[in-house]
Regions:
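Generic transmembrane alpha-helix signature in multi-pass membrane proteins
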Residues: 47-51, 100-109, 135, 159, ...
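Intrinsically disordered, low-complexity non-transmembrane regions of multi-pass membrane transporters
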Residues: 1-31, 225-237, 269-289, 431, ...
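Short, non-helical or kinked segments that cap or interrupt transmembrane helices
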Residues: 63, 85-98, 139-147, 201-206, ...
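Membrane-embedded alpha-helical modules
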Residues: 107-227, 333-440
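Juxtamembrane interface elements at the cytosolic ends of transmembrane helices
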Residues: 5-6, 10-12, 43-47, 51, ...
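Hydrophobic, membrane-embedded alpha-helices of multi-pass small-molecule transporters
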Residues: 27-38, 43, 174-185, 203-204, ...
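Membrane-embedded helical hairpins/re-entrant loop segments and their flanking transmembrane helices
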Residues: 25, 51-87, 253-327
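N-terminal signal-anchor module of multipass membrane proteins
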Residues: 2-92, 99-107
């Protein structure tokens, strides 16, 4: 009896195409486009937010967006193909992680792009090292710890998007115009997401982005980028160089731990929706391979001047919606993302999206991240001990997140590590989870 047969598979009444089933090229292309639509805005949002926060030149912003799409395609290819012990072998779509936005901004303010990419590259092996030991580490990195961190990520990113609503895309425009544009974009997303039409829900963010962009263009709020200079965006490894600063080791390492925990949940959900085992040797082989691939993909992303990659949970919803879990779709989707990343005009167009338009989208995206954290927390039993951990870690994280100046009296090395509410709150949850006595 094989390992696959020894472990019961979950019921998959809605599954039409299984993991290794083949689709005709038209069907595979359509399914791949649905997967790309579900993750497209989420993939370009982290580089856009970071570039805006650091006030990077337009050319650098466009290049970061292009490389994020390219690396998402390459990462998806590695996950789907599963060469040896690398990759999950599932229809696991890979995109740019939201978890690193805050440490990336802090590193960028301290040392620019070289420090950002240097720290990403230096700490990416954390996931590679952790991968073989994941079953034993689950008692330490519990859903409660992961949920606290994900909740803090969502809550503390929301203020960054409010700045985009207030900053004028055009100095001649009244500030209320920006709020109106962001509100209309948000309304479009909510309306489309509420419809009982699969295509509308999957493409809601992209359609709202397009509508907001066209409106701003008509209002003269968009500077049309020059897309005629080159037909191909050739990746330049280490284009901006590398730099390292040890105070940033802990924040970046901790975020890689967090994304590891998130990825385990994503791979488990993908396995269940694909009709594959969610326990046993085959399951753990996929988990280890998937997390290993996340670390490897993040290393490649840093080399190619992009930010850390992780699996996207929203794409599991597409599998559930369409009933298509075939790896073949992943190959097609990876090809689409790589194509988008290699065409400079796409990155330039996305970089020219006015801040109010992007803010209308990201306020919803960051809110959804916060609710995802709540869902993760609800997986655990909220007894007195868990509530203490939750209360203290959220208090520390939110407090420092909104008032980071309270860390200024401390030495610079400590301030740089703990001035992030996400890091300080997450580490508080981790330490309390280890040392608070459990009920016997």
């Amino acid at each position: 009896m094989s390992d696959n047969d020894s472990v019961p598979k979950p019921a998959t009444q809605n599954l039409i195409y299984g993991l290794n089933d083949k689709l005709s090229p038209p069907k595979a292309t359509l399914a791949a486009l649905q997967q790309v639509l579900a993750m497209f805005v989420g993939t370009i949002t982290p580089p856009t937010i970071v570039a805006n926060a650091l006030d990077l030149p337009f050319e650098q912003k466009a290049y970061l967006i292009s490389m994020s799409l390219l690396c998402s395609g390459l990462g998806t290819l590695v996950q789907v193909a599963a060469w040896g012990r690398i990759g999950s072998g599932l229809l696991s779509m890979t995109g740019t992680s939201f978890a690193f936005i805050t440490p990336l901004i802090l590193a960028g303010q301290a040392g620019g792009l070289p420090l950002m990419f240097g720290m990403c590259l230096l700490l990416a092996p954390v996931e590679v090292i952790l991968a073989p030991f994941l079953p034993k580490l689950q008692k330490i990195f519990t859903p409660l710890v992961a949920g606290v961190v994900v909740l803090l990520i969502g809550l503390l990113l929301i203020p960054t998007t409010l700045g985009g609503m207030a900053s004028p895309a055009n100095e001649s425009m009244h500030p209320i115009t920006n709020l109106a544009i962001a509100g209309c974009v948000l309304l479009i997303v909510l309306t489309l997401s509420s419809l009982h039409m699969p295509w509308a829900r999957m493409s809601a963010a992209l359609l709202a982005l397009l509508a907001g962009y066209l409106f701003c263009m008509k209002m003269g709020m968009v500077t049309r980028p020059d897309t005629t200079s080159s037909w191909l965006a050739i990746p330049h490894p280490f284009k901006y160089g590398l730099a390292f600063d040890w105070p940033f080791v802990l924040p970046f390492a901790f975020m890689y731990l967090v994304t590891t925990i998130e990825s385990i949940g994503d791979f488990t959900a993908c396995s269940e929706l694909s009709g594959e085992p969610t326990s046993g040797p085959i399951y753990w082989k996929r988990i280890r391979g998937g997390v290993f691939a996340d670390g490897l993909n993040s290393m490649v992303a840093a080399v190619l001047n992009s930010f850390p990659n992780t699996t996207f949970s929203q794409n599991n919803g597409v599998i559930q919606l369409t009933g298509i879990a075939s790896r073949q779709v992943g190959y097609y989707a990876a090809g689409v993302l790589i194509f988008f990343g290699l065409v400079p005009g796409i990155g330039s167009w996305l970089a020219s999206v006015p801040p109010p338009v992007m803010s209308g989208l990201t306020i919803l995206l960051f809110g959804l991240i916060a609710t995802a954290g709540i869902r993760i927390i609800m997986r655990t039993t909220l007894d007195h001990r868990s509530l203490l951990i939750l209360a203290v870690s959220l208090g520390v994280g939110i407090g420092i997140g909104f008032e980071p100046d309270i860390m200024k009296p401390l030495p610079d090395a400590i301030e740089n590590v703990f001035s992030s509410g996400i890091t300080s709150g997450g580490l508080t949850a981790l330490v309390l989870n280890i040392f608070l006595p459990k009920k016997k």
